[in-house]
């Protein structure tokens, strides 16, 4: 039998003075369908207002000691003691800093030998102090530490596949390494996840959720060339690993996110207002695709699926170290002048489209806390690290200097 209840949560007013208006919590509909628990937020939030992220400290300088100069930050990891570890793609090494942003030590260097990195792109840390680095250039996970322990190498067949996905680990010290399914034909390969136990032994291989789903594409053929390009704003699969194990996933066109549980599924949903795609932006996306594909197939014109009139509600998923879910949602774009425009370059546009970042934040049980609007210099690449009310992320200033910044959630209604 289907069970349904409506719950209206409220924020305590114990600290409020007379006449203070108390914000109500979210209106939530819960449902149980088979082994799936659905938590559907209709309106409201626990916080009662939007939040932002305020910087607490930063690591990185334009000039100064080499330890504080970053070339290109590829990955960030934060351990249980709140030490932060930074993987530099340009230098192919890791620098570790304590909770006060003071440099502690470095790990690795460019190369192919033990303890060396060739094309490292993602990093994670274990509770015992070990640092793990996914290095598809060397076809292995490189393991450093704890302390001065000799490095270890956990080999796997990367298929020379470089991915921007994080290196996932869980509370049982299992490691999930993304790789292509080499049993499938080239150009149509799904991602798989190779599961290592804490000692580096492969124990399982998992398929990405919704593996049969295919994003809409335009396909052009001519002169012996084949070019495939995704249709802008078309739905796609988004999935991440939860620190308790299991996937958190969804199709971006639906505000419906499934978290795998040992005995079922927790489905998190929220009412949303669709965000339109500006016709001007759709035209620009189509023209850019025609120019790019035209480099390989001269004269090609768009003949694929239309660009959607609305953006998918979800553009990214992130799970915090404590299990909170951060959902990056679509926002309306605006035209801005392209400061890097090259008038003589036909592939350089005079304007570009920008959309502000915005996250919906849920507790691990699906309770909607509220929305977070990060500052303009906040970047989602590499993926930030979320830990309770703290967030570690890369910021770039007007001179394009990278810094790793620790932020804290603050309600925008607070003085």
PLM features: residue spans?
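Sec-dependent bacterial lipoprotein signal peptides
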Residues: 1-14
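Eukaryotic scaffold repeat domains enriched in small/polar residues
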Residues: 16-415
């Amino acid at each position: 039998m289907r069970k349904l209840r409506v719950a209206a949560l409220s924020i305590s007013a114990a600290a409020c003075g007379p006449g203070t208006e108390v914000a109500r919590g979210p209106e939530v509909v819960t449902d149980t369908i088979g082994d799936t628990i659905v938590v559907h937020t209709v309106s409201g939030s626990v916080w009662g207002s939007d939040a932002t992220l305020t910087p607490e400290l930063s690591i990185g300088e334009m000039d100064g000691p080499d330890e504080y100069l970053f070339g290109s930050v590829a990955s960030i990891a934060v351990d249980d003691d709140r030490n932060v570890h930074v993987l530099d793609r340009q230098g192919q090494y890791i620098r570790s800093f304590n909770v006060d942003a003071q440099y502690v030590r470095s790990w690795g260097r460019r190369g192919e030998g033990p303890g060396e990195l060739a094309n490292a792109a993602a990093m994670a840390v274990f509770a015992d102090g070990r640092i793990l680095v996914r290095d598809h250039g060397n076809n292995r996970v490189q393991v450093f530490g704890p302390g001065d322990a000799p490095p270890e190498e956990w080999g796997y067949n990367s298929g020379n596949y470089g991915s921007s996905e994080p290196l996932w680990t869980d509370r049982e010290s299992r490691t999930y390494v993304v790789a292509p399914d080499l049993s499938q034909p080239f150009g149509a390969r799904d991602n798989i996840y190779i599961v290592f136990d804490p000692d580096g032994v492969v124990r399982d291989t998992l398929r990405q959720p919704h593996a049969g789903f295919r994003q809409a594409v335009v396909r052009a053929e001519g002169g012996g060339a084949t070019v495939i390009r995704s249709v802008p704003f078309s739905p796609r699969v988004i999935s991440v690993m939860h620190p308790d194990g299991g996937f958190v996933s969804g199709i971006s066109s639906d505000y419906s996110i499934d978290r795998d549980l040992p005995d079922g599924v927790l489905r998190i949903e929220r009412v949303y207002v669709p965000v339109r795609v500006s016709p001007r932006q759709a035209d620009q996306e189509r023209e850019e695709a025609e120019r790019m594909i035209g480099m390989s197939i001269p004269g090609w014109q768009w003949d694929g699926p239309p660009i959607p009139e609305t953006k998918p509600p979800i553009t990214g998923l992130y799970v915090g170290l404590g299990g909170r879910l951060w959902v990056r949602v679509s926002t309306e774009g605006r035209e801005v002048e392209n400061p890097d425009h090259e008038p003589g370059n036909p592939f350089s546009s005079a304007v570009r489209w920008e959309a502000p970042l915005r996250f919906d934040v849920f507790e691990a049980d699906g309770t909607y806390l509220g929305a977070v609007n990060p500052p303009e210099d906040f970047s989602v690449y590499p993926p930030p690290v979320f830990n309770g009310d703290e967030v570690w992320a890369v910021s770039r200033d007007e001179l394009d200097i990278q810094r790793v910044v620790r932020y804290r959630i603050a309600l925008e209604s607070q003085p």
